[in-house]
UniProtKB/Swiss-Prot annotation:
Active site per the UniProt annotation: 495
Chain positions covered by the region annotation Disordered: 90-111
Compartments, as annotated in UniProt: Mitochondrion matrix
Binding-site positions, Mg(2+) 1: 350
Stored InterPro entries: CCR4/nocturin_mRNA_transcr, Endo/exonu/phosph_ase_sf, Endo/exonuclease/phosphatase, PDE12-like_N
Protein name in the entry: 2',5'-phosphodiesterase 12
Lineage: Eukaryota, Metazoa, Chordata, Craniata, Vertebrata
One function term, GO molecular function aspect: poly(A)-specific ribonuclease activity
Gene responsible for this protein: Pde12
GO process terms (BP): antiviral innate immune response; cellular response to dsRNA; cellular response to interferon-alpha; cellular response to type II interferon; mitochondrial mRNA catabolic process; mRNA processing; nuclear-transcribed mRNA catabolic process, deadenylation-dependent decay; positive regulation of viral genome replication
Cellular-component GO terms for this entry: mitochondrial matrix; mitochondrion
Family from the record: Belongs to the CCR4/nocturin family.
Catalysis: reaction(s): Exonucleolytic cleavage of poly(A) to 5'-AMP
Enzyme class: hydrolase
Modified residues (Phosphoserine): 216
Amino acid sequence: MWRLPGRSALRGVRSVVERRSRAEAGTHEAVRAMERAVVRCVPSEPKLSLSFALADGSHKNMQRDQSEPLGRALSRIATNALKGHAKVAAAKKSRKNRAHSSGGAACEATGPEPVATCEPVVKLYYREEAVAEDVLNVDAWQDGAVLQIGDVKYKVERNPPTFTELQLPRYIMAGFPVCPKLGVEFGDPASSVFRWYKEVKPGAAEPGDSGPASSSHSSQPSAWIETGVDERVYTPCNADIGLRLRLHCTPGNGQRFGPSRELESLCPVEAGPGTCTFDHRHLYTKKVTEDSFIRTVSYNILADTYAQTEFSRTVLYPYCAPYALELDYRQNLIQKELTGYNADLICLQEVDRAVFSDSLVPALEAFGLEGVFRIKQHEGLATFYRKSKFRLLSQHDISFQEALKSDPLHKELLEKLALNPLAQEKVLQRSSVLQISVLQSTTDSSKKICVANTHLYWHPKGGYIRLIQMEVALVHIRHVSRDLYPGIPVIFCGDFNSTPSTGMYHFVISGSIAEDHEDWASNGEEERCSMPLSHCFKLKSACGEPAYTNYVGGFHGCLDYIFIDLNTLEVEQVIPLPSHEEVTTHQALPSVSHPSDHIALVCDLKWK
């Protein structure tokens, strides 16, 4: 069972919130002493919103100018209340007429229906005194005030914690964590309360065991029972297969709670794929590392924009079951794999924008990580860091071609490249980017780290382009780690599309590359752009040189690395890669048990 740390502070209030939440979500037979009027009022917006339910059952949402006198807002509320009474009376009369026309029993009363002919009295009270009608809305609607409409009183709640977004994944599998996408205003997910229920087929549940009432679309509503999980994340078990899930949640901010909400999964829990390639790796990463260690992950997760092409299905990955290439399926595997590493830093490549915001952020945030994103064209880079260990100080992302053209740091390199216009054109056409995040330790402010993440040009004959891109990257990293933050350690992750035998890898590890290296003519003599390059870092591949980090039907090789600065960091342990038997169980990658054509690199680093 997946559980979140740091929840003990909420235990004391959870039972109170749950009792209130159940009352709110229960049947309408229980009448509350005072209704709720929710006011949203923020200084940056000209209007405030007011939300409440009238006695006729209708729900009113009003937008009023903050600078408007209270009297006008109260007058509008009175008008709405009068309309509500009129609708109730009209509905009663319509039902009576239908009864007469269908031969139904006559009503005992023969007189006309009573209809409200005047607006109800509407007042706003604060500390038991009526608020003057010339007071502006922004000042009148205070938290704890009481709105009275006729005989009905409403407690005013100004800016309570509120869910602005609440969504469950479309595809849910047994054994894989379910992470709802949350948006909370005036609150935070960590201070909110969650309770999970699972469906029981009609006739299979005892009435006393059911949870909140269902609003199922089926002819017979489902019954619900508690799962016993009261955390943000729920991992369904095999017994849940075929059942839908329900989440009951109450937003909070550590001081108070807002209106509860419920949502149900659209589809029932599906069976999982069984053992995945990363399950054995998780045995090495059961716990978050201590403060002196930095568990780092680098992973090309295979962008959906590439996985869903006809070329991918028929040429690149014809051995992969089509459903296993679907994003909804792969997201379950990616989320489980990443959260199971308990990493402090995660650098991802080939991240679709929607995957970042709708899948990765909700999942990793629930496990204590925060992320930043850099778009390339159709996909981009994402870096996540553990909030309990690091805070983000600054970002220094660049596009290689833009930096090469406009940044004075690369003026000399551009002049050399311009000696071969054809090569220069090819380099400047590439859209590759570099993501740099400077992080500061939350426990020792003197400890900072430069985390770089990139995905270099992919073409097999693009060796010289990757050399130029790496030179731009290292110069920019030097500027950040030596000029802006002198002496901070460097971790450089990515898919470098270069095996250990290439010029790019030799350049990084040895610190220089000669102008006569064969990679300068990787696409023929007409594009040769020979030049000597060197850099000041002492870098090492933290995970060594595995036989492969990319394994597809027509190719396998080591393309991914976590480069570290040997002067400031050392490797504590490398998490073993999946065995060759695991990788080839379904011929190659991706597969039903592995979500990408790449394999994640995972290692524990240590400050020197």
